[in-house]
Amino acid sequence: HQYLPEKISGISIATQGIISPDGTAVTYGNIMGNTKMQLSDFSSRLPYPCHLEHDSKAAADLELWNHPQFDSALIFLLNQNLGGAMITGHSVHQGDHMRSGLFEHICIDPDGPACYCGNRGCLETYCSANALKVAAGMPVSEFFNILHNTQTPTLSQIWQNYLDHLAFAIRNLNLVIDCPVIISGYLAPYFMESDLLYLLNKINEHSLFQMTRDQLSVGEHGQYTPAIGASLHYVKQFLNLTK
């Protein structure tokens, strides 16, 4: 597509990695090896204003845009690598060092699989799309095609294990922030109603406080959620919605 330069407000970049509070650099980017990557690496080469954003926070921006009724929410970004974000007070919670919502590094089992962060048993090693791919021994799309169209006990058990670990994390985090949960990212389109009901049952199974079905939502934009969410930075500027 050819767009007139005056029609382009800027370029917003959603990247894996924790962004500095001033938005000028990546302070931790072990997955992509982009630690210390600078916003100026892009802005110096592109003829438009540039904005850098953590992909999980960008995803949360989009989910908040799509769910304006939510004052607070927990976002699980089920991409190739797991991501998380928190919405509080109708905005994405950043934290003092931009590290709020890193659900992927909650320890599920201290003796579990090695995580890229150097620890073991992080939620990343159980609930990322990559972890599901490794457990299934096949691409994610193929896994769900077989799972949804055939009776394959082995694959059903793999998916059940995945949902069990996700439910464990949701149940514990929901005690910290009493709010709705949004399943977002690459794996979200594969979730069926039966999966959500199973997940809800596992969340409530050992919980004193019960979550209801209306508190569990699925995002609509799949793997493109962070990219669309990042673009909202300039959309909000155009609409004069930035604080």
Q: What residue spans do the PLM features occupy?
A:
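Glycine-rich phosphate-binding loop and adjoining helix at the ATP-binding site
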Residues: 1, 5-72, 194-205
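ATP-binding/phosphotransfer module of carbohydrate and carboxylate kinases, centering on a glycine-rich
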Residues: 1-7, 46-48, 66-67, 114, ...
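Small-residue faces within membrane-embedded alpha-helices
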Residues: 14, 79-81, 229
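Short beta-strand/turn micro-motifs composed of small residues
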Residues: 15, 77, 185
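Short, active-site-adjacent cap segments at secondary-structure transitions
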Residues: 17-21, 57-60, 83-84, 93, ...
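Generic structural "secondary-structure junction" signal
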Residues: 20-21, 28, 33, 105-108, ...
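Glycine/GP-enriched mid-protein hinge/lid loop-to-helix segment characteristic of carbohydrate kinases
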Residues: 40, 44-153
